[in-house]
Structure formats: structure tokens, C-alpha cells
Amino acid sequence: MQQDLFGSDSICPISSDDVLKATDPNFESWRERIVQDALKIVEQIPKWKHLGNHDGVALYEKAPAYTGHTWYGRVSKHTRSLKTFKKGLLYEHIKKEADYDPLVFSAHQLETIIEDEIEIWMYKYKTPWFFRNRVYRQLVVSVMLDPDSFIVLQTPVTYPGSSSGGGNGVVALYDSVDFVSKKLDGDGKEEGVLWICAVRNDYGSMFSGLFSDTTFTKSLVRQVKLYNEWLNRTYPRKG
């Protein structure tokens, strides 16, 4: 049976050999299962420990029962349309993130299973000068769930002989789920979107120990601000 992608208390990288090709007879069921695994995380976030609201962003936390990696969640409401959010988050997710977040760089695609839907990307994350940059190799799955919502999930992928980050980087691990749905007013007209995000990270080495709850939640709020500013610059409102 296929393992729940996010069910463990710890981040569990998947082997590149376990990323099915679109021609595999089990591909459709494999893709559906990992999307459902991600949706379970989205549904759980309101039940996590509430850390308060900051700049219009509701923050949540779920610590592992014993040892492992803590999940952090955020929920925010936005007045931009679902169509505009698709341009910013659904398509070329990693490439766009490198455009609006200055800490993400050297993003490039390693594999394409289905273009703009299931891809493997590699990117680097800038760290303080006294640490080596972090390197991520991520499976990125981007799916329209229905006309009114979409989901993007990431989980780390390992390749044979890829334990090293190469150059001056250290391999790190990252799970994330982004869920965006259309918000409607009382008359059924679109009034923006709801953006729900869950992340957990293992930066590796001593670097992870520097990230307290406060540091990480500030980072989550910062990303919303950076994204909104970039979206408004790149896709300005008409009129």
C-alpha cells in the first residue's frame, strides 16, 4: 500500500524511482493518493494550536508527538481573483517563488512528468553568512481540484548519490501544501481567495536549532507580504 506522504511525524523523502511516470498504469491512482494526503493536512490545520494573528495572517502549529518535524500553518484572505492567484502560485510554482522571495535562488527543473503539473525542481535557500546555503530537490505537484480551487504540494526527492548539496550547499528537507479556493460573497460573486499553507522544514545540521517558533512564523507572514507585493507588481489590477 502506498504510504501517506505526510503521515509521519518526520519528513520522509521519496526516492526518484518512486515518482511514477505518466505512462505507468498506476500513475492516476498514485497522483490522486498524494493529492488526498495533502488535502488531509489542509483539513487538519484549524485543529492545530493557534499561535495568533499577525498582519491578517492566522498562524497554527502542530508539534510531533515525540520526535520529528513541527508543522506550521497559515491562513490568509486575499482580494485578488483565483485567476490571478493561479498565475502566481499554480503555474511554475518554484520559479515564481524565486521571483518574489530573495532567499530562494538557482531554481531549475530536474524532471518533467507532466508539464506545469508534476515536476521535480532543485533550488537553493540563502542562509546567514556563517552557514552554507541549503539545497532542496523537490517533487512539486500542482493540480486544479475543481473550477474554484487548486492545490500545490512539495516533498523532498532523493537521487542515487545525491546526499551532497554540491558546491557550497547542504541538502535540506521540506514538505509543504498550498491550497487556494475562491471566496464568494452573499450574492455568489467572487470577492477574492482563501490561501491556506502548511510547511515543515529540516535545514540540517545546527542550523535547524536556530529557528524558534517565533522565527519560523515571522517567515510565514513575511512570505505572504512578499507574495502580495510581487503579485500586484507583476499582475497589476486593471482600471
Swiss-Prot record:
Transmembrane segments: none annotated. Its main location: endoplasmic reticulum. It is found in: Endoplasmic reticulum; Golgi apparatus. It comes from the Eukaryota. The keyword Endoplasmic reticulum applies. The keyword Hydrolase does not apply. Pfam families: DUF3074. One of its GO terms (cellular component) is Golgi apparatus. Keywords: Endoplasmic reticulum, Golgi apparatus. This is Uncharacterized protein C577.11. It comes from Schizosaccharomyces pombe (strain 972 / ATCC 24843) (Fission yeast).
